[in-house]
C-alpha cells in the first residue's frame, strides 16, 4: 500500500509539471491550430537560465528565496521574449500557409533552440548546487518532501489562475472568442495578433516556471531535456483533448500517474525484464492508444475532419 501511495504522490507532482507544459501546447493549438513543437525547448531554456542564475548567486549573501525568485523571474523574461519573438518571426508569416509549413517550421525552431543552448551551455549536464535540503514527511508509509508539496500547490494555483483568467476577464473572453472563430472575432474588433502574442506570452511564462520546477525536482539541466519533456506534454494535451485548457490539466495529471505507476510496478509485472527506465515508453504508448481510439481526447469534441 505504501508503494502504491508513494507512486501516486510522485505521479501527481510529476503530472502537475506536465500539465503546466501541456497548457502551452493546448493554448496555441486552440488559437492557431498549430502544434508548437518548439515549446518543450522553451522550457529547456527556462531551466538552463534558472540554473545559470542559481549558480551565479550560490554561496553569496543573497537569501535562498530571493535566489529562486530571481532565477524564476529571469527564466520567465527570457522565455516570454523568445516565445513572442518566435511567434512574430517564424509563425505569423505562415498563418495562412498550408498546415504542413508551420509544423515543419516549429520542428526547425525546436532544433535551433537545442543547438543554440548547446553552444551557450555546452552539451554537458548542469547540476543544481545544493542551495537547500528539502524536509521529508511520512504519510501512511509514503514519503513526501516540502519541495514536492510546493511544486504541486504552485502548479495547481497557476493552473487555477489561468482557468479563472480565461473565463472571467475581458482578455480571456477575447482569447475564447478567437479560439472559436478568429475571423469573426477580428470583425468584432478583437486584435487577433495581440491575442496570439499574449497566448505565446502566457504559455512561455508557464513553461519557464515548469523548467524551474524540473531543475529543482531533478537537480539537473541539459540542452536536450526539452525534447522528451515536450513530447510527454504534447501527449498529455492530446490525452486531455488538445485545445481544451482543462483537458491539458487533466491529461497532465493522468499521464504523470500512469508514468509513475508504471515505473513502480513494471519490474514486478515483467518479472524483472523491464526496469523503471522504460517508463517513458508508457507515455508514448498512451499517445498511440488515444490517437487510435479517442483522437479528440478525454474532454475534446469529436470532429468529422480526418488528418
Regions found by a protein language model. Name each.
Residues 31-85, 89, 265-273:
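Membrane-embedded helix boundary and interhelical linker motif in transport proteins
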Residues 47-52, 75-82, 107-117, 154-163, ...:
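Hydrophobic core segments of alpha-helical transmembrane domains in multi-pass membrane transport
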Residues 143-221, 225, 245-251:
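Helix-loop-helix "hairpin" substructures at the membrane interface of multi-pass membrane proteins
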Residues 18, 68-77, 200-207, 217-284:
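Transmembrane alpha-helical segments in multi-pass inner-membrane proteins
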Residues 93-94, 99-168, 195, 261-280, ...:
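Transmembrane helix-bundle core of multi-pass membrane transporters
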Amino acid at each position: 500500500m505504501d508503494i502504491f501511495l508513494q507512486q501516486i504522490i510522485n505521479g501527481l507532482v510529476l503530472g502537475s509539471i506536465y500539465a503546466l507544459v501541456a497548457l502551452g501546447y493546448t493554448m496555441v493549438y486552440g488559437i492557431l491550430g498549430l502544434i508548437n513543437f518548439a515549446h518543450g525547448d522553451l522550457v529547456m531554456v527556462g531551466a538552463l537560465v534558472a540554473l545559470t542564475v542559481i549558480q551565479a548567486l550560490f554561496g553569496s549573501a543573497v537569501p535562498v528565496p530571493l535566489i529562486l525568485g530571481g532565477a524564476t523571474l529571469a527564466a520567465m523574461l527570457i522565455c516570454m521574449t523568445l516565445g513572442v519573438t518566435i511567434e512574430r518571426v517564424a509563425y505569423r508569416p505562415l498563418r495562412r500557409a498550408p498546415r504542413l509549413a508551420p509544423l515543419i517550421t516549429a520542428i526547425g525552431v525546436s532544433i535551433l533552440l537545442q543547438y543554440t543552448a548547446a553552444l551557450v551551455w555546452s552539451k554537458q549536464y548542469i547540476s543544481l548546487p545544493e542551495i537547500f535540503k528539502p524536509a521529508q514527511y511520512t504519510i501512511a508509509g509514503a514519503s513526501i518532501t516540502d519541495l514536492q508539496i510546493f511544486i504541486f500547490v504552485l502548479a495547481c494555483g497557476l493552473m487555477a489562475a489561468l482557468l479563472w483568467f480565461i473565463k472571467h476577464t475581458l482578455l480571456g473572453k477575447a482569447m475564447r472568442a478567437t479560439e472559436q472563430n478568429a475571423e469573426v472575432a477580428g470583425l468584432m474588433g478583437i486584435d487577433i495578433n495581440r491575442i496570439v502574442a499574449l497566448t505565446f506570452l502566457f504559455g512561455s511564462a508557464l513553461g519557464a516556471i515548469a523548467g524551474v520546477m524540473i531543475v529543482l525536482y531533478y537537480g539537473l539541466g541539459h540542452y536536450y531535456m526539452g525534447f522528451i519533456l515536450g513530447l510527454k506534454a504534447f501527449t498529455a494535451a492530446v490525452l486531455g483533448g488538445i485545445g481544451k485548457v482543462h483537458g491539458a490539466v487533466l491529461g497532465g495529471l493522468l499521464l504523470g500517474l500512469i508514468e509513475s505507476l508504471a515505473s513502480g510496478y513494471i519490474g514486478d509485472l515483467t518479472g524483472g525484464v523491464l526496469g523503471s527506465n522504460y517508463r517513458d515508453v508508457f507515455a508514448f504508448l498512451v499517445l498511440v492508444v488515444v490517437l487510435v481510439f479517442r483522437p479528440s481526447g478525454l474532454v475534446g469534441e469529436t470532429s468529422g475532419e480526418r488528418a
